[in-house]
Amino acid sequence: MNLFLVLFVFSFSVSQFFAVEAGGRKHKHQEVCIGSDGKGHQLNQFWYDNGNCRRFYCYKDEDGLVIEQTTNCELAVAENDCRIKPGKAGRYPDCCPSVECPQESKAS
């Protein structure tokens, strides 16, 4: 029974310190952000994952939680005669794909 109580208190403490929610990771009482890459990052500064074309940002909310925000490319949907144009190599958002449509022929 004591082991169960210890495990319950420990798991509750861990869940209060670290929570993963939609939109990012949250940490309490930290002055740096431990990003999803496992590295420490300064608050209120961007960092990038060029291989996966993502941008990250950490900030403190009104409750003192440090929140990691991840920004991905928008969904590119090509309809009709349009096509998906791959993004350039490099940082977000330049690496994101875009939709390219042919220009309509102008009547002479």
From Swiss-Prot:
Subcellular location: Secreted
Annotated Pfam families: SVWC
Keyword Secreted found: yes
Tissue spec. comment: Expressed by the venom gland.
GO molecular function: toxin activity
Keywords: Disulfide bond, Secreted, Signal, Toxin
Maturation and modification: Contains 4 disulfide bonds.
Entry GO CC: extracellular region
Family in the record: Belongs to the scoloptoxin-16 family.
Protein name, entry field: U-scoloptoxin(16)-Sm1a
Taxonomic path: Eukaryota, Metazoa, Ecdysozoa, Arthropoda, Myriapoda
